[in-house]
C-alpha cells in the first residue's frame, strides 16, 4: 500500500516557546510521507530564531502579516502538496509518535478522519458524526482531504468558529467522516477558544444561523442561546 502524503500545518504568532514544543513533537512522527509547513504571522518575539533552528527539516516556511488564525490556516492549505492536511498549531502536538502511522495503517475511504484528543492528560472521546451545536471532535485531531479544504476554505469572517463552520459544511454536503478509536492530538488548553467561551458560543450561533436549515436552527439554537447567556452571567 502506498502511504498518502500528509501535510502538517502549524500556524503561530508570538508564541516562540509553544512553537518549539510543537515543532519538536511533529518532527518525532515516525510516518515517512510527510511535509511540514509553518505559517507565522510576522511574529516580533524570537519565533524566527526558533524556526531557523529547525529550518533544514521544515518543508515550507512563510512569515508575513495575516488577517487572523483562519487566514493563516487557509494559506497553509494553499501551500500543501499532500493528499491530507492536519493542523497542529503552536502549543498542540500529536498524542504519540506513531499517530500518523496508525491512521494510515490501512486505506481509509473517507474525506475527514478524526479521533480522540488529550486535554490536561485526560483522553476526551470524540463523538459519532452528527449535525450539532458544536463540533463533535477537536480540529487538531482531524485529518481532512486537501481537496475538501480547498472547496470549503475557512471563512475568516468568523474569528473563533470558522473550523466549526467548515466541518458543518462538509457534513451537510455528505462528505465521509471516519472516527478512529484512539487519540490523535494533545491539545493546548490555553488557546483563545478556551479562554473566551461566550465569544465562541456567540460565533457558533452565527454559524448555525448561516448554514443550517430552519428546522435545524429551531432544534439547535434554543439550547445554544441558553448556554451562551449562562456563560455571560458567569462572566466566562
Across the structure, where does each feature detected by a protein language model lie?
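N-proximal low-complexity "stem/linker" segments adjacent to membrane-targeting elements
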Residues: 1-28
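Acidic helix N-cap motif at the loop->helix transition within catalytic regions
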Residues: 17-20, 45-53
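A conserved acidic beta->alpha catalytic loop
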Residues: 32, 40-49, 89, 93
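Glycine-rich, basic loop-to-helix element that forms the pyrophosphate-binding segment
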Residues: 63-80
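Short aromatic/hydrophobic "clamp" motif used to bind/position activated sugar donors
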Residues: 85
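Conserved donor NDP-sugar-binding/catalytic core segment of glycosyltransferases
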Residues: 93, 97-126
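Conserved nucleotide-sugar donor-binding catalytic segment
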Residues: 125-203, 207
Amino acid at each position: 500500500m502506498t502511504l498518502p502524503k500528509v501535510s502538517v500545518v502549524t500556524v503561530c504568532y508570538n508564541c516562540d516557546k509553544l512553537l518549539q514544543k510543537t515543532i519538536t513533537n511533529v518532527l518525532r512522527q515516525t510516518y515517512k510521507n510527510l511535509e511540514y509547513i509553518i505559517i507565522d504571522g510576522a511574529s516580533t518575539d524570537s519565533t524566527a530564531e526558533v524556526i531557523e533552528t529547525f529550518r533544514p527539516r521544515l518543508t515550507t516556511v512563510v512569515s508575513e502579516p495575516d488577517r487572523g488564525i483562519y487566514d493563516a490556516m487557509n494559506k497553509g492549505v494553499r501551500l500543501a502538496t499532500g493528499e491530507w492536511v492536519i493542523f497542529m498549531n503552536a502549543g498542540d502536538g500529536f498524542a504519540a509518535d506513531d499517530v500518523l502511522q496508525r491512521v494510515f495503517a490501512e486505506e481509509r475511504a473517507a474525506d475527514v478522519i478524526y479521533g480522540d484528543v488529550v486535554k490536561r492528560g485526560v483522553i476526551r472521546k470524540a463523538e459519532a458524526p452528527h449535525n450539532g451545536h458544536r463540533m463533535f471532535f477537536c480540529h487538531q485531531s482531524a485529518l481532512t482531504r486537501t481537496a475538501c479544504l480547498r472547496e470549503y476554505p475557512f471563512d475568516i469572517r468568523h474569528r473563533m468558529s470558522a473550523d466549526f463552520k467548515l466541518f458543518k459544511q462538509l457534513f451537510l454536503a455528505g462528505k465521509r467522516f471516519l472516527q478512529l478509536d484512539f487519540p490523535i492530538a494533545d491539545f493546548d488548553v490555553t488557546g483563545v477558544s478556551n479562554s473566551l467561551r461566550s465569544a465562541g458560543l456567540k460565533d457558533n450561533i452565527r454559524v448555525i444561523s448561516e448554514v443550517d436549515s430552519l428546522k435545524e436552527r429551531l432544534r439547535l439554537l434554543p439550547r445554544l442561546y441558553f448556554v451562551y447567556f449562562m456563560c455571560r452571567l458567569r462572566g466566562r
